[in-house]
Amino acid sequence: PGASAEEAFAHMVAVLAPLEDPHVSLVDPATQRSFSGGAVPRIVSQALAGLPADADDDAQAAALAATVDTIVRAREGYLDAPAETPIPRVLSAGTVGGRTGYIALDALQLRASLDFPDQADTLAAALDQVLAPLHDLPALILDLRANGGGSDRLSVAVAQRFATRALRVKKRVYEGGKLLDPRTIEVPADAHAYRGELVILTSDLTVSAAEVLTLLLAGRPRTRRLGDTTAGAFSDALYKTLPNGWLVTLSNERYEDEAGHSYEAEGLAPDVPTPAYSLVQLEAGHDAALEAALALVAR
């Protein structure tokens, strides 16, 4: 009582920040004051490290955009020839040395609205297009390091292309003051799925629906994960409007593997821990994690 709006906002941030959850946020539409939770991904810290302390939003956005371009340029330098894809800012693909397939999937959202009805069909068709020439290769690298998530429907569509057996995760929602019984998300086995060795690259940028995809594929035989532990933010965001008009988002879901273990807040650890990104190395055209994945499938 008696606190100013600025003081009240700061108090709310102090309560929310320790959750360290990327799906937790607070926005005051009247002043555009905002807070977003979650730890800052390492590559983002590296990208912003060279900016002055008072750098504005435009300068930070430019630095991050340049870093994305650096990531894409470095990884595509390993490809025999990048394949043409209908959604190039989301999906890229090719082969390395003629024997290993490579697919980079940078989002599980193709439109601003997650509910746009044809997203899953569009991504599925694009995946089928790039997978066709890779289907008979003995190994494939699926790069999810820069995937900021999106829709679980798209996660299922991607997992279907690799489902040599049925893949399952459980989803539990906290509602009405209690955690509801789990609902199973199942991807049935597909006779046309890619059957070779699969290496999934992850980082602390791999978040939300991208983590759900990673968890689904963790149940696939002949699959290993390499890179950094994922962000640990599987849950969707629950949106609420406070009485004073502020907007708050919270996590109210748990995703569990078939054994019932939840990786919310801890992230899904790789089988082969390897630093996912080094900006200095990437600027020199050197992607150490991708090289480690290539070495893994060459054994």
Where are the regions that the model predicts?
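Structural recognition of the beta-strand scaffold that forms the well-ordered cores
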Residues: 101-104, 140-143, 197-202, 224-227, ...
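Gly/Ser/Thr-rich loop/hinge elements
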Residues: 149-201, 205, 235-241, 252-256, ...
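Low-complexity, Gly/Ser/Thr/Pro-rich intrinsically disordered linker/tail segments
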Residues: 264, 268-299
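Terminal peptide-recognition signature
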Residues: 15, 103, 142, 198, ...
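Short beta-strands and strand-coil junctions in structured, solvent-facing domains, enriched
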Residues: 111, 207-208, 257
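Flexible, low-complexity junctional segments that flank or bridge functional domains
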Residues: 1-140, 144-173, 179, 238-241, ...
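C-terminal soluble interaction/assembly domains
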Residues: 208, 218-220, 227-243, 248-250, ...
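Bacterial peptidoglycan biogenesis and beta-lactam-recognition machinery
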Residues: 164-171, 218-227
